[in-house]
């Protein structure tokens, strides 16, 4: 069983889409094994997205991710990383396939509702950023 990390971003929370998006995730066969609502500071958002520090969108991303509450989750499923990337769709909702989370709910490339880990290795690193081992609970 593979795990991935997602974050329902501040725009998702503001639009009151937590339930709708979580429902899509569960209906796609993912198990939620950890979940919390939190608010990132500029410092914690900067640390989480440090890999993008030299990219032109970094400052805007940090501002956005610290603008309100978000909901990180660890998801579990066979082929979780790739399947989840398919479910959420392209970063730019205009390029996302019909029926994907971003096509349905995102407004722009910058405010695109949801984060999904891009590899199993990054999923493990990102999951540890938000969750201690004892917070991850698998229910069979």
Swiss-Prot record:
InterPro entries: NDK-like_dom, NDK-like_dom_sf, Nucleoside_diP_kinase. Its cofactor is Mg(2+). The keyword Cytoplasm applies. Keywords: ATP-binding, Cytoplasm, Kinase, Magnesium, Metal-binding, Nucleotide metabolism, Nucleotide-binding, Phosphoprotein, Transferase. Gene3D superfamilies: Nucleoside diphosphate kinase-like domain (3.30.70.141). Its main location: cytoplasm. One of its GO terms (cellular component) is cytoplasm. ATP binds at residues 9, 57, 85, 91, 102, 112. It holds the Pfam family NDK. Its EC number is 2.7.4.6. Major role in the synthesis of nucleoside triphosphates other than ATP. The ATP gamma phosphate is transferred to the NDP beta phosphate via a ping-pong mechanism, using a phosphorylated active-site intermediate. Homotetramer. This is Nucleoside diphosphate kinase. The lineage of its organism: Bacteria, Pseudomonadati, Chlorobiota, Chlorobiia, Chlorobiales.
């Amino acid at each position: 069983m593979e795990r991935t990390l997602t974050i329902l971003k501040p725009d998702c929370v503001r639009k009151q889409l937590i339930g709708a998006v979580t429902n899509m995730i569960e209906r796609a066969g993912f198990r939620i094994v950890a979940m919390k609502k939190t608010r990132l500071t500029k410092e914690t958002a900067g640390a989480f997205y440090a890999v993008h520090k030299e990219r032109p969108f970094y400052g805007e991303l940090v501002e956005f991710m610290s603008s309100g509450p978000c909901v990180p989750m660890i998801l579990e499923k066979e082929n979780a990383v790739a399947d989840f990337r398919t479910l959420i769709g392209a970063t730019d909702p205009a390029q996302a396939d019909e029926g994907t989370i971003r096509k349905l709910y995102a407004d722009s490339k910058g405010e695109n509702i949801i984060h999904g880990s891009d590899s199993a290795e990054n999923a493990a690193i990102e999951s540890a950023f938000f969750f201690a081992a004892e917070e991850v609970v698998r229910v069979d």
